Amino acid sequence: MTTPRLLAAALVCALAPAARADVTLPTGGTLRHVDFERHVMGLLSKAGCNTGGCHGSFQGKNGFRLSLFGYEPAMDHAALTRDNLGRRVNVLQPHDSLLLQKAVGSVAHDGGMRFGRDSWVYAVFREWVAGGARWTPGSGAIAKLTVTPDNFAVVAADQSRQVKVTATFADGTSEDITPFCDFKISDEAIASVDAVGRVTARQPGDAGLTILYRGAVVALRVIVPAPGAPATFPQPANFVDGLVFDKLRLLNMTPSGPASDEVFLRRVTIDTIAQLPTAAEVKAFAADPDPRKREKLVDKLLAHPLHAAVWATKLSDITGNNTTALEQPQNTAQRRSQMWHDWLRKRVQDNVAYDKTVRDILTATSLDGRAPEEWVAFTRRVDEQAEKTNGYGTDYPNKPTLDLFWRRQQAQPVEAWSEKVAAAFLGVRLECAQCHKHPTDRWTQEDYWGFANIFGTVTFANNQYSAPAVKDAAAKENADRKTAAEAGGKKANNQFLLVKEVFNSAQVKQAKNPGTNKIAPARVLGGERVVFVGGDDPRVKLAEWVTSPTNPFFAKSFVNRVWAHYFGVGLVNPVDDFSLANPPTNAKLLDALADSFVKSGYDVRKLERTVLLSRTYGLSFQTNDSNKFDKNNFSHSYIRPLLAEQVVDVLNSALGVDEQFAGQDAAPAGTKMVEVGSSRLNGNVAYALRIFGRPPRTTACDCERSAEPALPQTLFRMTDPTISNKLAAGTGRVQQLAKAKLSDEELVEEAFLATLSRRPTADEKASSLTHVRAARTRLEATTDLVWALINTREFILNH
């Protein structure tokens, strides 16, 4: 029996279509044939009809469902022409099509009016319906997109320029599809872009222009040169400057002059070791006539023990050193978090090649090829050391690999590991691809689940799947620990530490791609399959691919993180978001840094030295008329907030005190905040870390660490008892200055040098002297002066 639905579908296909006409496009061309995939689906995507918040949601909207982001043309064609008894299109009377009536507001539509009846968009839909609402499968398969201009769109101030997008399709034909694209610009203060790709300049600078067309993405930079005379440039110190200056020439931006010696000294000391230079160091550096003094300073700071601690802290963020996720009880987790930090610190201190460090994380096991008895003895020794020192100074950093990376209180699904590894070592965010291909990125569900399945053999458990010899050795050690705990009057539960193993298991866990309901073959991102053979650890092949010189992400991701640390903003920003829609602000510089890094054998210290000794790093934060709007081309130093750990250490450095770590947070005397590995602290310092944005390290996203200024940060410096106590410390800076035999002028100068790393200006000196001389006591004068200085914006920011 013929159903009404089938009859309606047959009528759509059989009845003679309405009269048709060419469509005049807003970019000046004429569209003579409307194609469902190329044009109709392009406009559905551009209008947002197939997004997750509209008809692309799993449930659809008001009975009408499209495929998410238009990835399934067959489904969408059926939804438009067959569902709802075919009422959405009317080939005999196209204007009566529900598709058009809702879009123009003639019929109630939750999405509101999407376009007007007189618009070219209406004409495209109308002509498609009038032509029989046909679909040619595969007609819109995209081979590539080409953009004119292909790299930089230079637009003079207050002028406009049209961007042209050409699609080459799988059948070999090409077409100008500019009006069917969606255009997004990263900074509307620099330029704006209209719906059909016309870019209008607003102020000097550059912005990223992202162009989307039915799942394909291309991007370019919009350049708005500064007006006026041609920019001038100093002699480059190295290749970094040459490539930065090349970009600035396009922008006609003259870089700022060099920072003063005092500013440079403060900047680089905070960046490299999270400390302030002493007053004596500031005076000596400013007076030193040696033309190589900055070079010598950088070399000294890069070799400083605290420099390794700074990068161990950053790498703890990157690798997910989350104390809460480690084995409990809490004191055990904190100790192991510290050991994790110290393992990373030793590798930075020893300048181990970065690719080796990453391989030693990705392929980590507990045994490291040792006999089970050796492993048990090492584990016992480390645990005993950790119990005495709260995790500091153990032998764990001498372990060849970082098995703590894989040790978690709760079992981790394979997809959690893939997201962590991609974000940490490739700068790639995969989360969206778990459910669908994001319209601004390349990764599909098959990419996501295939990459996840590489981690199907890594195991951390109570040795039930371990080799017999390992199981026996661990069982004996655990029994001995239990006996010792009970003999000491402790309960035999978490009071003793179970010996557990991270290893490559014969038990393979493989996840299905929910889109196909089939197991996705393990493979590297966008690359070859990883075959599970015998007892081979698939992570070895993963590590080889990740650290390969040909990997398009590995070296770039790390040099970008280094650049972002020293400049406050990455060449790709956010630093863990390398994607098609987020191109670098200076691609040639990023490529050159990565190439140099690879050729150096992944020498991190050499990379840092290159960056720190560039003229670019040494520029002043003070701007000129041509670069005052610059936010991402490094024509001047950017004023930037400190990391939370730097805030604590810089405050202590200025106030001449050490942080007090006690109880579960206990640390050796004199320990700096950047030397502490635990992400979960309990003392007074925990509040300061939280309000200044230290991350809990619970997700694989750099966005966890916040650098945004907030009122609690200001109130903390102004009123918190912790600051008051440090100001009043008997051996602290205030007491030292108050007791010293200094004139009023000398007191003011020393206070400025100790906090702002410079001498006061004439106005600052006069104002300070007035307050000092009005105070009732020398101690009161000194306390008020130092308190005022640490509450300045200049103090809490790096510039």
Could you describe each region identified by the protein language model?
Residues 35-52, 120-128, 417-433, 564, ...:
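Sequence/structural segment immediately N-terminal to covalent heme-attachment motifs in c-type
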Residues 8-16:
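Bacterial N-terminal signal peptides
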Residues 654-678, 682-716:
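Long, His/Glu/Asp-enriched segments that create or flank divalent metal/ion-associated functional microenvironments
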Residues 45-68, 130-139, 428-445, 618-619, ...:
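Periplasmic/extracellular electron-transfer cofactor-ligation site
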Residues 235-306, 311, 317-664, 703-704, ...:
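Primarily short, surface-exposed interaction patches in extracytoplasmic proteins
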Residues 115-135, 712-719, 723, 727-728:
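Catalytic cores of secreted or luminal carbohydrate-active enzymes
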Residues 1-8:
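Bacterial N-terminal signal peptides that target proteins for export
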Residues 21-122, 139-166, 174-237, 267, ...:
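Solvent-exposed helix-loop boundary motif
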